[in-house]
Regions:
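A polyanion-binding, active-site-adjacent surface
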Residues: 1-175
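Metal-dependent phosphoesterase core characteristic of DEDDh/y 3'-5' exonuclease domains
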Residues: 54-57, 61-63, 121-131, 138-142, ...
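Conserved "right-hand" nucleotidyltransferase catalytic core of DNA-directed polymerases
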Residues: 170-251, 273, 294-297, 312, ...
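Short hydrophobic beta-strand that contains or immediately precedes a catalytic carboxylate
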Residues: 42-44, 145, 208-210, 279, ...
Length: 842
C-alpha cells in the first residue's frame, strides 16, 4: 500500500456505491500500491489479490519492467466477491483515481481493459484502441491494452498482451523502433510521370504487398469507390520492403478522381506480373479490384498464414504487427475516408502495406521451419481464397417469388400460432401486477405463463440476481425441447413451433429480402479463418476496413435449415441446374482411418451400411429385420458417441438432433455397445487426450494444428472442452480441408475446360454448384471423381485407405435436389438416359 496516497485519498467510510456498501475493512476504498512517484502507473478494473499481483509482476518481468518501480491502482476501489462493478461504480470512484494520478504524477499509464481505458481517456473499445498512445489530462501518456483476465479466458491473447507490455516498456524508456521498421521512401503517385515510374518499378520488383481503402463494404453498391491504393515493394533476395507507393483514387482531393477507375485498370497487368503478391485479408481487396477491372491475384495472405500458424491468436494486421514487430498501433479515426484529409488517408494506407510486408517476411521465416503448413497454404488456403473471391462475386441465385411467398406464409403461421396460444392465456385480472402485456418471446410474461400459471417445472435458471434472488427460468430452445419430451403440453409445442417460424421469418426470409440484388442473387462472405477448428464459416459479417464496424454480407449458408421450405428458395436460374455434392459419413470415415478401427474400416471397404450394422448390434436382429426407426436410432448412436459423448448428454442430443427418445439407461447401454463394436475409437480418444496434455496441441493427418492451451486449465469444464476438441478437431478439419481442396481443383478444372459451371459455396462437408444444362453430362462425374480423389498422398504423403464417397444430387432448387445413384454417375449411358428423363438433355 502506498501510504502517501492512502493518507490523501482513502475514505474508509465511503458508501458512494453498492461496492462500498458491501466491502469491509481493508477491502473498502483500496488505493494505489507501489512507489510514490512511479515512472509507470498500471490501472486495472479492480484491486488485485496477492496471486493476481504476482501474475501481473511475472508478465512485467518478462519484458524487463521492474515491478518494484511500478505502481498499480484500480478504477473501482472496493474489493467484493459477488457484485459486478458497472458504470455507476466507476463514476463514483473516478474522483479517487483522478486524485491518485494527480499525487503520483506518473509519466506513463498502462490501462488494462475497457474500464481502465474509459476511466483514463474516456473511450470505449479496448480491441480498437489497444497499443495506441493517448494524452491524459495530467500530462501523462496512456497506452491501453487488454486485461490479464482476458488472457486467462483466451490464452491465444497472451502473445499480443506481452507484445503490448514490451511496446510500453520501449516507449516509457525512450527506446525507438528498429530502423528497418520505420516507414520511409514513400511516393505519392499524383502525376502521370509518377504513375509510369510505379509501373516501371513493378517490372523489376520481386514482391508486392497491396491494400485498398474503400468508402464502404459492398463493392456492388452504385456509389462504391476505391479511395486509395497502396503498394509496398521489395526486390529479389531482400528480406525487408524497399519502397512504398500510395495512389490516391476516388478521394475528393485526388488528382485521379475523374479517371480513378482507369488507373485501377492500368495497374492490373503490372501488379499481376510481380512474382510474389501479398495482402492481408486479400480476398476483400481482390473482390473490389475485380469490380473495377483489376484481376490481380494473391500468392500469399498474411491473415491466412497467421491462422494456419496459430488459430487462437488475433489475426488483424495491427495486433499481428504489434506482436511480431513490436510496433505501435496506427489508425485513422474518421468514419468516412472520403471526408478525411487525403494526406492522412494515404499515410494510413501506406502503413498497412508496409507492415503487411514486414509480417510476411516474419511468417516466411516461420514457415521455412514448418514446410507442411507452407504446403497447406500453397495447395489449399491461398488458391481457395482466389476461388471464393469469384464465388462471392457471383453469389447464389434465389427464386424471388418463392422467397416472398414463403416469407408471407411464415408470418401467417406465426399469427395462427399466436391466436391459438391466446386461448390458453388467462384473463388479465389473473396476471401479476407488474406484467402489462402478452409477450410470447422469452420475457417476464412468458416465464410467468409457463412456470407459474401452467406450473411447468423449471429445468434451468439464469445467473443469480445481484440481490440474491434466483435467476430467471431458462426458455432456451434446448430446455423447451426437454420439457416437450418429458412434460408434454400443447403450449410447449406451440412455443417451439413459434420459435421455428419466427426464425424463418426474421432471421431468414426478411434478411434475404433485404440482401437480394437486382440479379436475384445474394452475395455472402466465406471465411477461411472463421473457426479455430479449420472449418469454413460464411456470412458472419466483415469488419469495415476503416471504422471497424461489423456489417452483414449475405447469408450464413452453414445455418440455412435443411427444411425444404427454406432451402427451396435457393437454386439455379432458368437454363441451369443446382448440384449438391456431399461427402457421405465423412467424419465417421476419417475417424476410422485415424483410429485404425478395423471393424469400421472393413464396413466401409466392403460397402456395408454402418448404421444398419450398429442397429443389428443394438437389437440383436439380422439386417433384414432392422426397422427404419431402429436405423435412425443407430445413426444417432454412431454420430453421438464418435467423439466420446457421455450417456446423459446423448439423451438430449438424440432428441434434439434426431427426434429419438432415449432413456439414460438405454443411452448407457448404447454407449457400451458402440465402444464394444468399435474398441479402437476409445483407445484413440485416450491417445488424443494424452497428446494434447503432452504437447498442448493435436494435428490432423495433413499437419493442420489445433493448439489447446486450455488443456491445463484448472477449471474442469474448460479442460473438458479442450479434451473434446483434441478428438474432434483433427477429424473435422481434415474433412473440411478435403472439401476445400476439391473445390480448388474443380474451380481450376472448370476454367481449364472453358466451362460455365461454377461453385456457389460450401456447406460443411458439401460443395454446391450451378451448371448449365448442356454441361451436366460432363461435370457431374467430374465433380464426384474429384471430390473422391483429392491427391492427399501426392501432396501430403497421406495414404487414405478408407473409401471416400461423394453423393451427387441435382435439381432446380437446393431443397429439392434428387440424389443420383452412385453407379449411374460413373456410367455415361445410364447418366445420359437419366438426364433425358429429367428433361435436362439438350
Amino acid at each position: 500500500m502506498n501510504l502517501m496516497v492512502q493518507s490523501e485519498v482513502r475514505d474508509s467510510n465511503c458508501e458512494g456505491c453498492k461496492l462500498a456498501q458491501q466491502a469491509t475493512g481493508l477491502d473498502r476504498c483500496v488505493t494505489a500500491e507501489g512507489p510514490d512517484k512511479p515512472h509507470l502507473l498500471i490501472v486495472g478494473k479492480l484491486p488485485l489479490s496477492e496471486r493476481q499481483r504476482e501474475e501481473l509482476n511475472n508478465y512485467l518481468r518478462e519484458v524487463d519492467i521492474d515491478p518494484d518501480t511500478t505502481a498499480y491502482t484500480a478504477v473501482n476501489k472496493c474489493r467484493t466477491w459477488d457484485i459486478v462493478a458497472g458504470k455507476k461504480e466507476q463514476k463514483a470512484c473516478s474522483p479517487y483515481l483522478d486524485r491518485e494520478i494527480e499525487l503520483m504524477k506518473p509519466e506513463w499509464i498502462l490501462a488494462l481493459g475497457n474500464e481502465a481505458l474509459s476511466a483514463t481517456v474516456g473511450r470505449s473499445g479496448i480491441m480498437k484502441y489497444r497499443g495506441r498512445e493517448f494524452d491524459h489530462t495530467s500530462g501523462a501518456k496512456v497506452v491501453p491494452t487488454i486485461s490479464p483476465s482476458m488472457v486467462v479466458r483466451n490464452p491465444g491473447q497472451r502473445a499480443g498482451f506481452v507484445a503490448d507490455l514490451a511496446y510500453v516498456k520501449r516507449l516509457s524508456s525512450g527506446e525507438d523502433i528498429a530502423e528497418k521498421l520505420r516507414l520511409k521512401n514513400v511516393t505519392a503517385v499524383t502525376t502521370k510521370e509518377r504513375l509510369r515510374a510505379l509501373i516501371d518499378h513493378l517490372k523489376t520488383a520481386q514482391g508486392i504487398a497491396f491494400d485498398i481503402e474503400t468508402n464502404g463494404f459492398d463493392e456492388f453498391r452504385d456509389d462504391a469507390k476505391i479511395v486509395s491504393l497502396s503498394i509496398t515493394t521489395w526486390m529479389a533476395d531482400d528480406d525487408h520492403p524497399t519502397a512504398t507507393w500510395v495512389v490516391p483514387l476516388a478521394h475528393p482531393q485526388s488528382p485521379w478522381r475523374p479517371q480513378w477507375e482507369k488507373v485501377v485498370r492500368v495497374l492490373n497487368k503490372p501488379m499481376s506480373q510481380v512474382p510474389v503478391r501479398v495482402a492481408h485479408n486479400g480476398k476483400f481487396d481482390c473482390r473490389w479490384l475485380r469490380q473495377f477491372g483489376n484481376r490481380v491475384s494473391l500468392t500469399a495472405d498474411t491473415m491466412l498464414t497467421a491462422h494456419m500458424l496459430d488459430e487462437n491468436r488475433p489475426k488483424g494486421l495491427k495486433p499481428l504487427a504489434q506482436t511480431l514487430l513490436g510496433v505501435g498501433a496506427w489508425d485513422i479515426s474518421t468514419k468516412d475516408l472520403m471526408s478525411d484529409p487525403l494526406k492522412q488517408v494515404l499515410k494510413y494506407n501506406a502503413y498497412d502495406t508496409f507492415y503487411t510486408a514486414h509480417v510476411y517476411f516474419v511468417f516466411e521465416r516461420q514457415l521455412a521451419e514448418k514446410p507442411h503448413l507452407k504446403k497447406l497454404l500453397d495447395k489449399m488456403s491461398v488458391p481457395a481464397s482466389e476461388a471464393f473471391t469469384d464465388i462471392e462475386r457471383e453469389g447464389i441465385w434465389v427464386d424471388r417469388e418463392a422467397m416472398d411467398t414463403n416469407a408471407h406464409i411464415s408470418k401467417m403461421e406465426l399469427k395462427t400460432i399466436d391466436d391459438e396460444l391466446m386461448t390458453y392465456v388467462p384473463d388479465k385480472k389473473e396476471w401479476p401486477e407488474d406484467i402489462k402485456e402478452v409477450n410470447f418471446n422469452p420475457s417476464k410474461f412468458s416465464r410467468w405463463f409457463l412456470f407459474d400459471y401452467l406450473e411447468l417445472p423449471v429445468l434451468e435458471r439464469g445467473k443469480e440476481k445481484p440481490n440474491g434472488d434466483l435467476g430467471d427460468p431458462s426458455m432456451a430452445e434446448a430446455n423447451m425441447q426437454k420439457l416437450q419430451r418429458d412434460h408434454p403440453h400443447r403450449v410447449i409445442d406451440l412455443l417451439l413451433a413459434r420459435t421455428k417460424w419466427q426464425k424463418y421469418s426474421s432471421a431468414f426470409f426478411s434478411a434475404y429480402q433485404e440482401q437480394i440484388d437486382h440479379n436475384d442473387r445474394i452475395h455472402t462472405t466465406f471465411k477461411l479463418t472463421g473457426t479455430v477448428t479449420g472449418r469454413l464459416s460464411s456470412g458472419k459479417g466483415d469488419a469495415d476496413k476503416v471504422t471497424g464496424r461489423v456489417q452483414n454480407r449475405g447469408v450464413n449458408l452453414q445455418q440455412v435449415p435443411r427444411d425444404k421450405f427454406v432451402r427451396g428458395i435457393f437454386g439455379a436460374p432458368p437454363g441451369h441446374v443446382f448440384i449438391e455434392c456431399d461427402y457421405s459419413q465423412v467424419e465417421l470415415r476419417v475417424a476410422a482411418f485415424l483410429a485404425r478401427e478395423e471393424t469400421m474400416l472393413n464396413l466401409y471397404r466392403t460397402g456395408q451400411d454402418i448404421h444398419t450394422n450398429m442397429a443389428m448390434r443394438m437389437t440383436n436382429k439380422p439386417a433384414s429385420e432392422v426397422t427404419k426407426d431402429e436405423r435412425k436410432k443407430a445413426k444417432a448412436v454412431n454420430f453421438g458417441f464418435l467423439y466420446g459423448m457421455g450417456a446423459r448428454k446423448f439423451v438430449d442430443t438424440a432428441w434434439s438432433n434426431y427426434g429419438v427418445v432415449v432413456t439414460e439407461e438405454e443411452a448407457m447401454a448404447f454407449r457400451k455397445a458402440f465402444f464394444d463394436e468399435f474398441p479402437m475409437l476409445h483407445r484413440w480418444h485416450n491417445k488424443q487426450r494424452a497428446l494434447a496434455r503432452k504437447y498442448k496441441r493435436v494435428e490432423s493427418p495433413i499437419g493442420r494444428a489445433r493448439n489447446l492451451p486450455d488443456i491445463d486449465s484448472p477449471h474442469q469444464t474448460v479442460r473438458a472442452e479442450a479434451e473434446r476438441q483434441s478428438i474432434n478437431s483433427p477429424v473435422q478439419s481434415f474433412a473440411s480441408d478435403m472439401a476445400v481442396m476439391a473445390l480448388v481443383l474443380l474451380n481450376q478444372e472448370f476454367k481449364d475446360r472453358g466451362l460455365e459451371t461454377h461453385s456457389v459455396g460450401t456447406v460443411h462437408d458439401a460443395i454446391n454448384f450451378q451448371a448449365p444444362i448442356d454441361e451436366l453430362e460432363e461435370v457431374i462425374p467430374l465433380i464426384k471423381h474429384t471430390m473422391e480423389n483429392v491427391p492427399m498422398e501426392e501432396w501430403f504423403g497421406v495414404h487414405l485407405d478408407v473409401p471416400i464417397v461423394a453423393d451427387v444430387a441435382t435439381g432446380e432448387r437446393w431443397g429439392g435436389a434428387e440424389e443420383l445413384d452412385n453407379d449411374m454417375v460413373t456410367d455415361p449411358v445410364r447418366l445420359r438416359e437419366w438426364l433425358a428423363k429429367q428433361h435436362y438433355a439438350v
